């Protein structure tokens, strides 16, 4: 019997053993010499987070999307001016941040961040049991923040853009000495229209009405004929989603567009001034323009990015990081496709506004992140150049020979202090 084939089998086995031994030598266990790729990312063990990380670290450690956000083609032609938001906010001067709080957009949480979570020279004074905080400028008895949790509903419950822009300057002049010029920086929060609509339905179902809202426009509130109520009695408790959607005068429909648009452009709440086909494009265009020109707006679905952009816009830092909470009442609603389609149809203007807002928001975020990375690269480049120049200058310095040390001939004992 021929044994040569059996001998040839040992050759590849020995080769494999040789490769394995060599690999263990070149790439020992736990070594950093070799990396393996999964897809396009290196597989590695992330370093342990520090006990008290800065907010910048939190962006990188807890949200991997932050460092490399997906770049998608935009359907909107935003200019660099649209993307640039760098407010020279002077908290010690006459500048005022005005928070436009749209229902069920996470505004309550964001409003609390403004009064409790900003690192300030003179923090807001929030006393237990009180709904409002005192947010004064350093060394002055003047407020720098106009919001629910600082000045209260001074312009009416959930006042909209039309109300605030006409009311805030008057209120501020009444409460504080009139100024020749105050800078009012308007901010707001937006939310996915379907989620926001469902959240409002759930809130109304539990008894909320907001019936004390003024809805002031062109100097007056709407009449009962212009804005009829959707229910009889004190509230709409227990309302079904079908009934909620069936009310044609339900202000939940396209609420975000209505609260951000200049309603005086369409005759306020008087629907007889123009038909719907004329009214809707004007409202949407006005809401987009006002939103784009605001100092800042955030999105409920992007809490960390909202925090990041606010900090970079106003040059104010939050003490603790924002938290993304996706387990909401709206998220727990089981919604059929036909029901979702109807909600989207009822909120068609809000759907278009949110698409616009989300695109602009993410582009602003990418723009600021890219600008920061460029500044960091330039800073590192300048540091390296400074180090190189320093080394060159040191190499050109003349070498001084060590001089012979002069030894003293005095007796050591004479140098000892006698106590």
Swiss-Prot record:
Tissue distribution: In early somitogenesis, expressed in presumptive forebrain and midbrain, tail bud and Kupffer's vesicle. During mid-somitogenesis, ubiquitous expression which is strongest in the somites and eye. During late somitogenesis, predominantly expressed in eye, hindbrain and ventral somites. At 24 hours post-fertilization (hpf), restricted to lens and neural retina, brain, otic vesicle and somites. At 36 hpf, brain expression is restricted to telencephalon. At 48 hpf, restricted to telencephalon and pectoral fin.
SUPFAM superfamilies: P-loop containing nucleoside triphosphate hydrolases (SSF52540)
Enzyme Commission no: 2.8.2.-
Catalyses which reaction(s): alpha-D-glucosaminyl-[heparan sulfate](n) + 3'-phosphoadenylyl sulfate = 6-sulfo-alpha-D-glucosaminyl-[heparan sulfate](n) + adenosine 3',5'-bisphosphate + H(+)
InterPro entries per the UniProt record, alphabetical: Heparan_SO4-6-sulfoTrfase, P-loop_NTPase, Sulfotransferase
Spans traversing the lipid bilayer: 8-28
Top-rank taxon: Eukaryota
Effect of residue 203 to A: Significantly impairs catalytic activity
Gene3D superfamilies attached to this UniProt entry: P-loop containing nucleotide triphosphate hydrolases
UniProt membrane topology term: Single-pass type II membrane protein
GO cellular component: membrane
Residues annotated to bind substrate: 131-132, 148, 153, 158, 203, 210
Lumenal side: 29-419
Keyword Transmembrane helix: yes
Active site positions, chain numbering: 158 (proton acceptor)
Subcellular localization, as worded in the UniProt entry: Membrane
Keywords (A to Z) from UniProt: Glycoprotein, Membrane, Signal-anchor, Transferase, Transmembrane, Transmembrane helix
Effect the entry attributes to changing residue 104 to A: Significantly impairs catalytic activity
MF terms in GO: 3'-phosphoadenosine 5'-phosphosulfate binding; heparan sulfate 6-sulfotransferase activity; oligosaccharide binding; sulfotransferase activity
Residue positions the entry lists as glycosylated: 77, 270, 275, 326, 393, 402
Outcome (variant: residue 101 to A): Significantly impairs catalytic activity
Record: residues binding 3'-phosphoadenylyl sulfate: 101-109, 191, 199, 323-325, 329-330
Transmembrane recorded as keyword: yes
Function summary: 6-O-sulfation enzyme which catalyzes the transfer of sulfate from 3'-phosphoadenosine 5'-phosphosulfate (PAPS) to position 6 of the N-sulfoglucosamine residue (GlcNS) of heparan sulfate.
Family indicated by similarity: Belongs to the sulfotransferase 6 family.
Name of the molecule in the record: Heparan-sulfate 6-O-sulfotransferase 3-B
Organism (species): Danio rerio
Gene name for this UniProt entry: hs6st3b
């Amino acid at each position: 019997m021929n044994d040569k084939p059996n001998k040839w089998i040992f050759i590849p086995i020995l080769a494999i053993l040789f490769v394995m031994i060599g690999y263990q030598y070149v790439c020992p266990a736990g070594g950093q010499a070799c990396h393996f790729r999964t897809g396009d990312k290196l597989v590695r063990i992330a370093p342990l987070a520090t006990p008290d990380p800065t907010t910048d670290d939190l962006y990188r450690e807890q949200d991997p999307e932050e460092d490399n956000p997906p770049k998608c083609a935009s359907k909107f032609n935003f200019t660099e001016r649209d993307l640039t938001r760098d407010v020279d906010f002077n908290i010690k001067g006459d500048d005022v941040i005005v928070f436009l709080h749209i229902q069920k957009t996470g505004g309550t949480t964001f409003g609390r961040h403004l009064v409790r979570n900003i690192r300030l020279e003179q923090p807001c004074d929030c006393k237990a049991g009180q709904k409002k905080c005192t947010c004064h400028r350093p060394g002055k008895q003047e407020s720098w923040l106009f919001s629910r949790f600082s000045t209260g509903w001074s312009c009416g419950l959930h006042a909209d853009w039309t109300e605030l822009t006409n009311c805030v300057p008057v209120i501020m002049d009444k409460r504080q000495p009139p100024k020749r010029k105050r800078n009012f920086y308007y901010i707001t929060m937006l939310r996915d229209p379907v989620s926001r609509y469902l959240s409002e339905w759930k809130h109304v179902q539990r008894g909320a009405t907001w019936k004390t809202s003024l809805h002031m426009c062109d100097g007056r509130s709407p009449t009962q004929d212009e804005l009829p109520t959707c229910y009889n009695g004190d509230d709409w408790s227990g309302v079904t989603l079908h009934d909620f959607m069936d009310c044609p005068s339900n202000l939940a429909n396209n609420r975000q567009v209505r609260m951000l648009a200049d309603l005086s452009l369409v005759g306020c709440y008087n629907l007889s001034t123009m038909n719907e086909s004329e009214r809707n494009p004007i409202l949407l265009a006005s809401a987009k323009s006002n939103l784009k020109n605001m100092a800042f707006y955030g999105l409920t679905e992007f809490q960390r990015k909202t925090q990041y952009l606010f900090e970079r816009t106003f040059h104010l830092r939050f003490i603790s990081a924002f938290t993304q909470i996706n387990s909401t009442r709206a998220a727990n609603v089981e919604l059929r496709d036909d029901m979702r389609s109807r909600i989207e149809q009822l909120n068609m203007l809000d759907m278009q506004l949110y698409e616009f807002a989300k695109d602009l928001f993410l582009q602003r975020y990418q723009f600021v992140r890219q600008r920061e990375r460029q500044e960091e690269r330039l800073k590192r480049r300048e540091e390296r150049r400074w180090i190189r120049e320093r080394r060159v200058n040191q190499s050109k310095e003349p070498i001084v020979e060590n001089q012979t040390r002069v030894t003293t001939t005095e007796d050591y004992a004479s140098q000892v202090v006698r106590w």
